[in-house]
Amino acid sequence: MKLELVFIPSPGDGHLRPLVEVAKLHVDRDDHLSITIIIIPQMHGFSSSNSSSYIASLSSDSEERLSYNVLSVPDKPDSDDTKPHFFDYIDNFKPQVKATVEKLTDPGPPDSPSRLAGFVVDMFCMMMIDVANEFGVPSYMFYTSNATFLGLQVHVEYLYDVKNYDVSDLKDSDTTELEVPCLTRPLPVKCFPSVLLTKEWLPVMFRQTRRFRETKGILVNTFAELEPQAMKFFSGVDSPLPTVYTVGPVMNLKINGPNSSDDKQSEILRWLDEQPRKSVVFLCFGSMGGFREGQAKEIAIALERSGHRFVWSLRRAQPKGSIGPPEEFTNLEEILPEGFLERTAEIGKIVGWAPQSAILANPAIGGFVSHCGWNSTLESLWFGVPMATWPLYAEQQVNAFEMVEELGLAVEVRNSFRGDFMAADDELMTAEEIERGIRCLMEQDSDVRSRVKEMSEKSHVALMDGGSSHVALLKFIQDVTKNIS
């Protein structure tokens, strides 16, 4: 019998792309599986041209056992105030999701029986469990971040619900550390993302976190060799969650990005081909990472002082009070130090949107200054490129702590991990700090570089036949089949 799974990603490139890739892994591994990915459109003000192009490309890529269904944008525009209302926005799509799944479950030809086997929902789409329950099928979760942050999230919820301990009371502490079972080192509270330190957000987040336990299993975009402490926690008898399957690294590694025909990007890739091995530092801060003029100048000064070749993905952050993806700077000469572009013309390239995986794959790249988004972190490890951490928002502070302090797989740019792109005030990183981080990152014989090379090899092995993630994915497919038998 053929089995049908419904995948529901959260809006946003960082959630949609990994879920698409893990769906492809599923259909590649089992000929009896078919998957429909139901795509929820971005909230008003968050969509970008790259994201729209990617979704359009998916619609044309549908095949017999992997199809895509893009839902309609609600007639009433959603509020620009996204703080507690994001989950309400997702919840509004439940009727459309139900109608879409009803069409999937219509009786087909008698000679090709298929059965709905379950929903795989994104970590921010837990309310879709209600729809799965209406169809009488199990739900599973895909966690786009790492196992360590999953462990932190459920531990903080446990403290809140069981121990009556509210970590947001520690918001202003710069010295308090918390023992968490998914790490071997105490985690400074200053590394917590703002969502866990804001009383307004905690009840909203924990309503989602509690529902993790309603699933039959959790797929995590990591591999067992990378996060042994977290996986030890989840595999123990006291684990607070259902089975956790490590199926990563799951990445979209297409060399051609959505703007691959762009002359500027093609020029940068050609330029990289002409540079010595491991001589170029790459600075890129994700789909939501941008800077204002003051910080851009400090980065420019640091790059020039360091003397290293560079590729810099530079975009303008939204004005304070606005939310949305960063925009292109219209005139770099106006915001960068006078004469910078001329003085660095032979050793550096600046671009807006960057084809990140194509750049990281180039042998000329010797280091990666990153916001520590989990997808970017996995890409840096996959390509064996050491990373300097500059977390900006969400769980990136925790990712940075894990990579630098817990695993020794990165160096830090800043001494404090506190930061958030929605904070009221910017914390300016000085040119001296940035230069120091770049010089440390680009050391050719560092222990970090050696450890990254070793972990890169392990990441590839994990996905091979018999590798830890390959075995976990097969186990998940077996369990899906067993759970509907």
Swiss-Prot record:
Bilayer-spanning residue ranges: none
Molecular function GO labels: UDP-glucosyltransferase activity; UDP-glycosyltransferase activity
Domain of life: Eukaryota
Enzyme class, broadest EC rank: transferase
Disruption phenotype: No visible phenotype under normal growth condition, but resistance to hypostatin treatment.
Positions annotated to bind UDP-alpha-D-glucose: 287, 354-356, 371-379, 393-396
EC number: 2.4.1.-
Keywords: Glycosyltransferase, Transferase
Family: Belongs to the UDP-glycosyltransferase family.
Function recorded in the entry: Glucosyltransferase that glucosylates the cell wall inhibitor hypostatin in vivo to form a bioactive glucoside.
Name of the protein described by the UniProt record: UDP-glycosyltransferase 71B2
Organism: Arabidopsis thaliana
Gene name per UniProt: UGT71B2
